[in-house]
């Protein structure tokens, strides 16, 4: 089974990807992980990607596509894969389809985890992390016993820069601009399936499992 996972930042894609990977015995392929692995191994594509990242630039499509293609040729992808973080644009989606067609394969489903913006804002801006031990909390869903203090080591809890309202809104705007055309692309291809990401982890995964069971 070959799956694309779509959804806004904070939609719980990482959690669901892990569950899908385990249940269906397919590798969870995150573009971030691929970049880090290639940079660490100093592959030609990794060296090129690092050059852009070090200069604060977006890695061009041709480099990203090259790294993803290389990963998809590994033996563990023979029976399928779950792609997370790629494609991000229609151009990348078209390149992926062309590559798969060249090896007589195609995507089975593009899974979209739908979560309203206000829900994402509450989920992400409410996150707090301990400055000492790294324990995670949420001011509403998983609050510490004493406000602003870690239950484990009693050190200060902070909000990460990535979780400020301004940063979250900016990330959502980028996601919206990039991903809506991508959603329409997969709708036109007839392979998109949507799940409600505001439900519990188990409920979301149950719905995903039902969809993937139908598409097997």
UniProtKB/Swiss-Prot annotation:
The keyword Nucleotide-binding applies. One of its GO terms (cellular component) is cytoplasm. GO terms for molecular function: adenylate kinase activity; ATP binding; zinc ion binding. Pathway: Purine metabolism; AMP biosynthesis via salvage pathway; AMP from ADP: step 1/1. AMP binds at residues 31, 36, 57-59, 85-88, 92, 160, 171. It catalyses: AMP + ATP = 2 ADP. Residues 30-59 are annotated as: NMP. ATP binds at residues 10-15, 127, 136-137, 199. Keywords: ATP-binding, Cytoplasm, Kinase, Metal-binding, Nucleotide biosynthesis, Nucleotide-binding, Transferase, Zinc. It is found in: Cytoplasm. It comes from the Bacteria. It is an enzyme of class 2 (transferase). Residues 126-163 are annotated as: LID. The keyword Hydrolase does not apply. Its EC number is 2.7.4.3. Pfam families: ADK, ADK_lid. Its main location: cytoplasm. Belongs to the adenylate kinase family. Monomer. Catalyzes the reversible transfer of the terminal phosphate group between ATP and AMP. Plays an important role in cellular energy homeostasis and in adenine nucleotide metabolism. Consists of three domains, a large central CORE domain and two small peripheral domains, NMPbind and LID, which undergo movements during catalysis. The LID domain closes over the site of phosphoryl transfer upon ATP binding. Assembling and dissambling the active center during each catalytic cycle provides an effective means to prevent ATP hydrolysis. Some bacteria have evolved a zinc-coordinating structure that stabilizes the LID domain. This is Adenylate kinase. It comes from Clostridium botulinum (strain Langeland / NCTC 10281 / Type F). The lineage of its organism: Bacteria, Bacillati, Bacillota, Clostridia, Eubacteriales.
């Amino acid at each position: 089974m070959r799956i694309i996972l779509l959804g806004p930042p904070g939609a719980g894609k990482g959690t669901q990807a892990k569950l899908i990977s385990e249940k269906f015995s397919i590798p969870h392929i995150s573009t971030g992980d691929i970049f880090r692995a290639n940079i660490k191994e100093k592959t030609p594509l990794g060296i090129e990607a690092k050059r852009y990242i070090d200069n604060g630039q977006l890695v061009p499509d041709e480099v990203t596509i090259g790294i993803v293609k290389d990963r998809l040729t590994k033996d563990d992808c023979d029976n399928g894969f779950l792609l997370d973080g790629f494609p991000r644009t229609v151009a990348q989606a078209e390149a992926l389809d062309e590559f798969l067609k060249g090896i007589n394969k195609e995507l089975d489903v593009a899974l979209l985890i739908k979560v309203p913006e206000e829900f994402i804002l509450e989920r992400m801006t409410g996150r707090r992390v301990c400055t000492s031990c790294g324990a995670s909390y949420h001011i509403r869903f998983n609050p510490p016993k004493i406000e602003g203090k870690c239950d484990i080591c009693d050190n200060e809890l902070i909000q990460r820069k990535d979780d400020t309202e301004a940063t979250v809104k900016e990330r959502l705007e980028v996601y919206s601009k990039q991903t809506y055309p991508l959603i329409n692309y997969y709708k036109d291809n007839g392979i998109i399936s949507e799940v409600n990401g505001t439900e519990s982890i188990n409920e979301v995964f149950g719905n995903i499992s039902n969809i993937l069971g139908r598409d097997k």
